[in-house]
Amino acid sequence: MSDISDANKLKHRFRGYFPVVIDVETAGFNSQTDALLEIAVTLLKMDDEGLLGIDKTLHFNIEPFEGANLEPEALAFNGIDPTNPLRGAVSEKEAFLEIFKAVKKAQKASDCHRSIIVAHNAAFDHGFVSKAIERCDLKRSPFHPFATFDTATLAGLAIGHTVLAKACIMAGIPFDNKEAHSALYDTERTAELFCHIVNRWKQLGGWPLLAAGESEDADGEE
């Protein structure tokens, strides 16, 4: 990076990775057997000052794949009725084709070379997303196959709490527990939390890093 304006570009902030915030609601914990029922995807943008913010969110209710397991306890927890026609559910393939299209467009606009999933307890969401992509036999996924940014871990470090609701409140982000466990609501709160942590780190002087030459110059100053 040649100057601060370069450091304030999204393509330089995460080594060319474009962060995509995702939340899923499912019919259980097993990504191989349990249905993916809902997914929301929040795309981010960076302003001229290098501050990260929400761009837009996509949301889909998903039809359970053929033969999917539906755990009653999971459905009771998230309140989803997979048989309700008012859900307007689409197939996994239809949803992910739209997601791929939007993510790749935003990734290209930011001059990034790949996207990386951001999620709260990211291994869970990444597992369900990866398995759905595999089931649909979709090629050229924009997402890194294993790397993620986990906001539970980041919040534990930066804020001192790993629970999404608690971390948001401690960060000054309103959180309504009555709206929680909706993929749309949780994704946008997760996105706000991720942006807060990234921006706070910048405001505290953690980014951009000083180049080696700049560091030596600073050490020599009285």
UniProtKB/Swiss-Prot annotation:
Q: Which positions fall inside the Exonuclease domain? A: 20-194
Short name of one Pfam family for this protein?
RNase_T
Which InterPro entries has this protein been placed in?
Exonuclease_RNaseT/DNA_pol3, RNase_T, RNaseH-like_sf, RNaseH_sf
User: Which cofactors, if any, are listed as required?
Assistant: Mg(2+)
Coiled-coil portions: none
Q: Report the protein's function.
A: Trims short 3' overhangs of a variety of RNA species, leaving a one or two nucleotide 3' overhang. Responsible for the end-turnover of tRNA: specifically removes the terminal AMP residue from uncharged tRNA (tRNA-C-C-A). Also appears to be involved in tRNA biosynthesis.
Residues involved in Mg(2+) 2 binding: D23, E25, H181, D186
What's a BP term from Gene Ontology annotated to this protein? tRNA processing
Q: Which UniProt keywords apply?
A: Exonuclease, Hydrolase, Magnesium, Metal-binding, Nuclease, tRNA processing
Organism name: Shewanella sp. (strain ANA-3)
What EC numbers are recorded for this enzyme?
3.1.13.-
CDD domains named among the record's database cross-references:
RNaseT
First-tier enzyme category under EC: hydrolase
Q: What family does this belong to?
A: Belongs to the RNase T family.
Active-site positions on this chain: H181
**Positions bearing the site annotation: Important for substrate binding and specificity:** F29, F77, F124, F146
**Under what name is this protein listed?**
Ribonuclease T
Q: Which cellular component appears as one GO term in the record?
A: cytosol
Residues the entry annotates as binding Mg(2+) 1: D23
